[in-house]
């Protein structure tokens, strides 16, 4: 295949995956602004003011902030809140701001899960609601149809989405072309709406109606939901294809459609009940509902896949316990399925659909998670600009300060919607933050306890006398510590009075980069007396495979035969106590998560028939 064809294929794929969320925003953004919980009178002045706000919000928050500025802050090609967090963590190590910034990154990851629950619900609901334009009698079927579509979507996740994924690009290309054509068809009847490109309309609207415009910001931000996906998916497609797709198709199509809806409302204010599905003739409504449903399913799929990816990153970065990760493609390493994440999302999405009943009710819940994440991204990237890009402090203050001011304005406009549904992402964010920080703190306490009980390796080596027999073969002891003796080895010595001829003390560590190449995967040192220390390194986007890593040790003169290799694991049982460190309820939560974590043998892909587990009890 020629480079040109590969480039076109990558571009079409990027359009299918990256822009699904922001691409389906025209279904509800303008409708919610004029007819939502804080409705705005549909007058020409207000239409021009809102259109100007939408235009400049998209240009500043997506084009300038994400496409031009933040997409430069890649972590070895990867993007997203956790990749940005890992980059900032590395840059600020040893500084006072290190811990607060790390907590901000964790909050962003927590808010992401609230967002990933709301997106499938609001997207598919808004598409199916188009049936109400055909006849109001179909309103009763909107929620059941939405539930069926989403159930099928989540049910097929375990089979992989490779085959269906090939259709994503062409379908979304058709979607964006349809958005553009519908917009143009209405703009020709009221071309004066294009004057709203001037920022003076937005400024006048804000000064004439300060309270109304503040409420409007809470809905206008719906036009940029999914903008952060441009940065999140950068690792899959690269910076250039995403930028090319944005400027070449997605941005023009979105703006044309919003201005087309504005032109429609100038001629027919009653169309505000569902302006998107009123853009075309009546015969087009049903085909448009079908196309919109496909587009929203694709948008939902992108968010679900993103949730799997964030879960894997969080596990690797020590923020979540081990979970089962299934690779659904033999060709694409990034195509994974995380059962726990999938079904947690499914039940949450179903609860939202049944509980909120309409996209308008859900819109109030949507903005908080998105604006909160965007604001944190801006704060984190300010440190990248200052410490990595070496921007002048004045440039950082002006550029990042302006973006942060905009982020805060949108966040403030959404935080007032707590009672209307904004409580949901805050609740999910709080639960997620508690889980992430409890696991991180619990693991730190465990490491501290193990270090306190650790016996120096040289003491053990000196104690190896004639009473200790040497068994044939190799023993691999997995340990989180890079010094001292693993508890499993001490237990083996104490109870069996034997040590293997070759002992490999193995630590699997996660780098603050997305990928570690095979050439840098393993590092082995000879300690003496048949003992060796092995460090296996993986990136936070990779899944550990200990047997595969052992096969790379040939460069150190070591070969491993699985039939003569035994793996020794220490299985700790944690006992909550009143010792200082964590609140008792958090210790119990940590213990519960540990008991339900995927077994180390499964997670590290170790043959179960070659494993010996030795138990130990720890107070935390």
UniProtKB/Swiss-Prot annotation:
Which reaction equations make up its catalytic activity?
A: K(+)(in) + H(+)(in) = K(+)(out) + H(+)(out)
- Which Pfam family, any one, appears in the UniProt record? K_trans
Task: Give the way it sits in the membrane.
Answer: Multi-pass membrane protein
Q: Which UniProt keywords apply?
A: Cell inner membrane, Cell membrane, Ion transport, Membrane, Potassium, Potassium transport, Symport, Transmembrane, Transmembrane helix, Transport
Q: Where in the cell is it found?
A: Cell inner membrane
InterPro entries annotated for this entry? Answer: K+_transporter, K_trans_C, K_trans_N, Kup
Highest taxon of source: Bacteria
Care to name a GO molecular-function term for this sequence? potassium ion transmembrane transporter activity
Q: What are the GO cellular component annotations?
A: plasma membrane
Spans traversing the lipid bilayer: 7-27, 50-70, 102-122, 136-156, 168-188, 211-231, 246-266, 284-304, 336-356, 368-388, 393-413, 415-435
What is the role of this chain? Transport of potassium into the cell. Likely operates as a K(+):H(+) symporter.
Protein family: Belongs to the HAK/KUP transporter (TC 2.A.72) family.
- What is the name attached to this protein's record? Probable potassium transport system protein Kup 1
Biological source species: Rhodopseudomonas palustris (strain ATCC BAA-98 / CGA009)
């Amino acid at each position: 295949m020629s480079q040109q064809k590969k480039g076109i294929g990558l571009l079409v794929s990027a359009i299918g995956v990256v822009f699904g969320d922001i691409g389906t925003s025209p279904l509800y953004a303008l409708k919610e602004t004029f007819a939502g919980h804080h409705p705005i009178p549909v007058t020409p002045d207000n239409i021009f003011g809102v259109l100007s706000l939408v235009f400049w919000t998209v240009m500043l928050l997506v084009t300038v902030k994400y496409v031009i500025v933040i997409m430069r802050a890649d972590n070895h090609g990867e993007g997203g809140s956790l990749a940005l967090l890992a980059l900032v963590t590395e840059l600020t190590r040893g500084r006072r701001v290190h811990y607060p910034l790390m907590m901000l990154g964790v909050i962003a990851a927590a808010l992401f899960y609230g967002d990933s629950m709301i997106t499938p619900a609001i997207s598919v609901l808004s598409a199916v609601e188009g049936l109400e334009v055909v006849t109001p009698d179909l309103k009763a079927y909107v929620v059941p149809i939405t539930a069926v579509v989403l159930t099928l979507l989540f049910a097929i996740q375990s089979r992989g989405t490779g085959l269906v994924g090939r259709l994503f690009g062409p379908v979304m290309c058709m979607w964006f072309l349809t958005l553009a054509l519908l917009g143009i068809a209405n703009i020709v009847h009221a071309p004066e709406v294009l004057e709203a490109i001037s920022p003076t309309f937005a400024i006048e609207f804000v000064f004439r109606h300060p309270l109304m415009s503040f409420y409007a910001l809470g809905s206008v931000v719906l036009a940029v939901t999914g903008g952060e996906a441009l940065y999140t998916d950068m690792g899959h497609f690269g910076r250039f294809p995403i930028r090319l797709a944005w400027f070449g198709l997605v941005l023009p199509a979105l703006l044309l459609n919003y201005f087309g809806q504005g032109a429609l409302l100038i001629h027919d204010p009653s169309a505000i009940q569902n302006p998107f599905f009123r853009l075309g003739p009546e015969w087009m409504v049903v085909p448009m509902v079908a196309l919109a449903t496909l587009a929203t399913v694709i948008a939902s799929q992108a968010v679900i896949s993103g949730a799997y990816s964030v879960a894997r990153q969080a596990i690797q970065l020590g923020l979540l316990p081990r979970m089962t990760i299934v690779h659904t493609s033999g060709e694409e390493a990034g195509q994974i399925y995380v059962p726990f994440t999938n079904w947690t999302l499914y039940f949450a999405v179903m609860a939202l659909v049944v509980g909120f009943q309409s996209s308008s009710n859900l819109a109030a819940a949507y903005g908080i998670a998105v604006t909160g994440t965007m604001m944190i991204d801006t704060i984190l990237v300010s440190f990248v600009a200052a410490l990595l890009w070496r921007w002048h402090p004045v440039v950082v203050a002006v550029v990042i300060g302006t973006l942060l001011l905009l982020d805060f304005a949108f966040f403030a406009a959404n935080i007032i919607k707590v009672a209307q549904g904004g409580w949901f992402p805050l609740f999910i964010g709080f639960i997620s933050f508690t889980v992430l920080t409890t696991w991180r703190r619990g693991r730190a306490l465990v490491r501290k306890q193990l270090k306190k009980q650790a016996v120096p390796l040289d003491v053990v080596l000196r104690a190896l006398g004639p009473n200790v027999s040497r068994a044939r073969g190799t023993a691999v002891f997995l340990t989180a510590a890079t010094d001292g003796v693993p508890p499993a080895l001490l237990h083996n010595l104490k109870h069996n009075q034997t040590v293997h001829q070759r002992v490999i003390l193995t630590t699997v560590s996660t780098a603050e980069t997305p990928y570690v190449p095979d050439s840098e995967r393993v590092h082995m040192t000879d300690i003496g007396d048949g003992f060796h220390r092995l460090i296996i390194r993986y990136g936070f986007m990779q899944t550990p495979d200990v047997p595969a890593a052992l096969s790379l040790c040939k460069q150190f003169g070591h070969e491993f035969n699985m039939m003569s290799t035994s793996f020794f694991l220490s299985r700790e049982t944690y006992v909550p106590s009143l010792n200082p460190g964590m609140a008792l309820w958090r210790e119990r939560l940590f213990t519960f998560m540990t008991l339900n974590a995927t077994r180390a043998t499964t997670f590290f892909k170790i043959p179960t028939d070659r494993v010996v587990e030795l138990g130990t009890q720890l107070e935390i």
